[in-house]
């Protein structure tokens, strides 16, 4: 993509309404635009990042055996009355009527609808286990939306729902999603720590929030430093191997980790002082086993191997891709702007033509652009006629992992300067050497 043809509305000043780093940088770098309180448009560069996050989520959900569907945003109030949640949910739910005066709602979540889909088609235990997921926009009428897309009223969610014959099956479905989430966050460039969460009236211990440590986090969290050294399950993880999954979950839940709500001072005291980490954290995912909470009132049953009907045991697993984008910025930025992990960067590299109109600079820039494009690097070429300071500020702000600086002096010497955005390291390379280095990383 050529910057001269790209819609990138950069803001020179920090927006006054932005309270946290991610909100400020997303507005300044032209990723989003606020349309009303807690509601945002995603602009080209922001949408590219969001789509890359969703691609990783899909790949890991599919790897774990989940099936993607797409449920509508508008739901019937009747389904929610079946579960008993319509009147109990509160003012966060946007309730509407169609022209026939039928009561509808803008879905804040999808347990009722996915349970209705399941009960309409699945009759036998032989069709289990089953996991259905979708990625869809949700709306919750927050009293005080703030922090940009971190706590907005409209947001993108990946919701997965598992259906199993009994608790043991549901536990393994939970473990599969647990491991899938560890891999997802690692691929997005985040180190997420699973922390035991409240299970409410259902009880048990199958509820975890995945938290990343960040100074601007909403929650106070406590964890053993051992988490920072745990190896994330690799791409060779066998999601059909129950013993392997159980071992992984055990390793990732044995050290102490808790949010402020679940913190236990007595257990915390057992952690060696030098291993205690007390910090702020951002929730990036939540997984939860809720048994027959929805299958019982909605009649989601299957015939078991004993010939009798059994209520299915369910779980839900949520990740907010839009929130995850903001969390990645909170975890990786500096005073100059965003520092994207390579896996979700909007472009693989930025080529900065320091003197558009100069035959030498134009020729080298075009050669680099063509070579990187053909190699699948997806470069952004800054071919705009602006002063060097503005070009450097823009390329740093949008956070591309690698910058290639093409200037008259370097071109005369047959070289370009390659800068690593994260480390700030610069090296002068011959043009072919630079192409080889960057294409090897594609």
Curated annotation (Swiss-Prot):
Membrane-spanning parts: none
UniProt keyword annotation of Ligase present: yes
Record keyword Zinc-finger present: no
CDD domains assigned: ProRS_anticodon_short, ProRS_core_prok
Location(s), subcellular: Cytoplasm
Enzyme superclass (EC): ligase
Function per UniProt: Catalyzes the attachment of proline to tRNA(Pro) in a two-step reaction: proline is first activated by ATP to form Pro-AMP and then transferred to the acceptor end of tRNA(Pro).
Protein name: Proline--tRNA ligase
Organism of this sequence: Brucella melitensis biotype 2 (strain ATCC 23457)
Lineage: Bacteria, Pseudomonadati, Pseudomonadota, Alphaproteobacteria, Hyphomicrobiales
Gene: proS
């Amino acid at each position: 993509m050529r910057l001269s043809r790209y819609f990138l509305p950069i803001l020179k000043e920090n927006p006054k309404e932005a309270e946290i780093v991610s909100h400020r940088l997303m507005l300044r770098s032209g990723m989003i635009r606020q349309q009303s309180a807690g509601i945002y448009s995603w602009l080209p560069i922001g949408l590219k990042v969001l789509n890359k996050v969703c691609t990783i989520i899909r790949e890991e959900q599919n790897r774990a055996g989940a099936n993607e569907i797409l449920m509508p945003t508008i739901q019937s109030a009747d389904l929610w009355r079946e579960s008993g949640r319509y009147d109990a949910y509160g003012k966060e739910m946007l309730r509407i009527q169609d022209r026939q005066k039928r009561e509808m709602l803008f879905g804040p979540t999808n347990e009722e609808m996915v349970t209705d889909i399941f009960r309409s088609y699945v009759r036998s235990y032989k069709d289990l286990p089953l996991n259905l997921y979708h990625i869809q926009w949700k709306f919750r009428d927050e009293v005080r939306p703030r922090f940009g897309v971190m706590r907005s009223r409209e947001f993108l969610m990946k919701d997965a729902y598992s259906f199993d014959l009994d608790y043991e099956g549901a536990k393994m479905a939970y473990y599969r999603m647990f491991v899938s989430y560890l891999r997802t966050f690692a691929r997005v460039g985040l180190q997420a720590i699973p922390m035991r969460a409240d299970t409410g009236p259902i009880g048990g211990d199958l509820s975890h929030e995945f938290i990343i440590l960040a100074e601007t986090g909403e929650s106070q969290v406590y964890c053993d430093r051992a988490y920072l050294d745990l190896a994330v399950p690799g791409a060779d993880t066998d999601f059909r191997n129950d013993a392997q999954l159980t071992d992984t979950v055990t390793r990732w839940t044995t050290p102490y980790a808790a949010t402020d709500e679940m913190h236990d001072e007595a257990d915390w005291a057992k952690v060696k002082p030098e291993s205690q980490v007390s910090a702020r954290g951002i929730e990036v995912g939540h997984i939860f086993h809720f048994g027959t909470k929805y299958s019982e009132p909605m009649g989601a049953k299957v015939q078991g191997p004993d010939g009798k009907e059994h209520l299915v045991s369910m779980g839900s697993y949520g990740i907010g891709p839009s929130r995850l984008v903001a969390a990645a910025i909170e975890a990786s930025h500096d005073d100059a702007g965003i520092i994207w992990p390579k896996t979700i960067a909007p472009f693989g590299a930025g080529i900065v033509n320091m003197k558009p109109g100069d035959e030498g600079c134009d020729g080298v820039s075009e050669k680099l652009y063509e070579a990187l494009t053909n190699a699948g690097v997806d470069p952004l070429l800054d071919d705009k006629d602006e002063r060097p300071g503005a070009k450097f500020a823009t390329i740093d702000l949008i956070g591309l992992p690698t910058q290639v600086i093409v200037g008259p002096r370097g071109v005369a010497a047959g070289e370009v300067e390659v800068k690593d955005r994260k480390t700030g390291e610069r090296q002068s390379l011959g043009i072919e050497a630079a192409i080889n280095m960057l294409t090897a990383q594609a």
